């Protein structure tokens, strides 16, 4: 589960390294975000020469969470970190590579470009 002030690792090569969640999008009272949810975040760490700079406000989609997620078949999936991918206003990734595994639940949310760039889909 991801909420306001949560620090996310960035799982792409957009130039950002850490994001801090400002808001979970999707309703006025939506407090927690899960895999596939879109958040508004601030870049807290960035590498020099990247597409995004420290202090930028970006949109990101959550691709990994430490909190387990229940699947339709009754199994649970959880990851070692909370991670997101920086996206543009068309919900497409701003980066050209995705690092680490991503969850299969992104397919139901129509993030096909992220799934195709990912090395491993779990």
From Swiss-Prot:
It holds the Pfam family Ribosomal_L14. One of its GO terms (molecular function) is structural constituent of ribosome. GO terms for cellular component: cytosolic large ribosomal subunit. Keywords: Ribonucleoprotein, Ribosomal protein, RNA-binding, rRNA-binding. One of its GO terms (biological process) is translation. Binds to 23S rRNA. Forms part of two intersubunit bridges in the 70S ribosome. Part of the 50S ribosomal subunit. Forms a cluster with proteins L3 and L19. In the 70S ribosome, L14 and L19 interact and together make contacts with the 16S rRNA in bridges B5 and B8. Belongs to the universal ribosomal protein uL14 family. HAMAP family: Ribosomal_uL14. This is Large ribosomal subunit protein uL14. It comes from Fusobacterium nucleatum subsp. nucleatum (strain ATCC 25586 / DSM 15643 / BCRC 10681 / CIP 101130 / JCM 8532 / KCTC 2640 / LMG 13131 / VPI 4355). The lineage of its organism: Bacteria, Fusobacteriati, Fusobacteriota, Fusobacteriia, Fusobacteriales.
């Amino acid at each position: 589960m991801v909420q306001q002030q949560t620090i996310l690792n960035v799982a792409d090569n957009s130039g950002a390294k850490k994001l801090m969640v400002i808001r979970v999008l999707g309703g006025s009272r939506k407090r927690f975000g899960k895999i596939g949810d879109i958040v508004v975040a601030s870049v807290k760490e960035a590498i020099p020469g990247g597409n995004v700079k420290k202090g930028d406000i970006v949109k990101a989609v959550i691709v990994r969470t430490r909190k387990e997620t229940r699947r339709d078949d009754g199994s649970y999936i959880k990851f070692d970190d909370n991670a997101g991918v920086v996206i543009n206003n068309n919900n497409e990734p701003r980066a050209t590579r995705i690092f680490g595994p991503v969850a299969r639940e992104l397919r139901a949310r129509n993030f096909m470009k992220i799934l195709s760039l990912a090395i491993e889909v779990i």
